[in-house]
């Protein structure tokens, strides 16, 4: 039972960190990267399909070039990008859709860093909430006589170590994203 607390805590904290890492991946950095299109879906023969599955996406300089497998998808892809809340402006030249990424201003970059910080803080709160819930469960089990006081203290220490580990991991994710945003 003692090890199950640690295993459960680690699994939950790891999932929280992975979720935050995924959110950070989708945060704009001003770079032309196909990852910005991952969430954009089009209606492909009645099935919502990601743009990345119906077109070849390449990066050239400061732009993405989207070349659909079927030419009739050009307008559909263009409209889907315009409808997304990414603030991108696609240009359809009849054979490909191009998306230009202008050099971001310092103000835009600072805004993106601030957003990254908010996302990471949400992750830290989630990790700490997991710690709080598990520690409450441990105290309840001790009161019920299911675990000893020594086990309780050892678990509290191990749970705190896990919390510190995953909070540090979130800090590293933020530093990496901040560097990526501010580097140009």
Curated annotation (Swiss-Prot):
Function summary: Responsible for the release of ribosomes from messenger RNA at the termination of protein biosynthesis. May increase the efficiency of translation by recycling ribosomes from one round of translation to another.
Superkingdom to which the source organism belongs: Bacteria
UniProt record, GO biological process: translational termination
Protein's recorded name: Ribosome-recycling factor
Assigned GO CC terms: cytoplasm
Cited InterPro entries: Ribosome_recyc_fac, Ribosome_recyc_fac_dom, RRF_sf
Cell location: Cytoplasm
């Amino acid at each position: 039972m003692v090890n199950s607390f640690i295993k459960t805590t680690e699994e939950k904290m790891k999932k929280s960190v992975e979720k935050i890492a995924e959110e950070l991946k989708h945060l704009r950095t001003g770079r032309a990267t196909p990852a910005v299109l991952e969430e954009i879906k089009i209606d492909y023969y009645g099935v919502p399909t990601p743009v990345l599955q119906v077109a070849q996406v390449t990066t050239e300089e400061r732009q993405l070039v989207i070349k659909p497998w079927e030419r009739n998808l050009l307008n559909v892809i263009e409209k889907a990008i315009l409808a997304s809340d990414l603030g991108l402006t696609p240009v359809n030249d009849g054979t490909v859709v191009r998306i230009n990424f202008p050099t971001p201003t310092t103000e835009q970059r600072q805004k993106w860093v601030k957003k990254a910080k908010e996302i990471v803080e949400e992750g830290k709160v989630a990790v700490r909430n997991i710690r709080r819930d598990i520690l409450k469960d441990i105290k309840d089990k001790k009161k019920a006589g299911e675990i000893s006081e020594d086990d309780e203290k050892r678990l509290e220490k191990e749970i705190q170590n896990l919390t510190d580990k995953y909070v540090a991991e979130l800090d590293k994710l933020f530093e990496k994203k901040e560097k990526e945003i501010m580097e140009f």
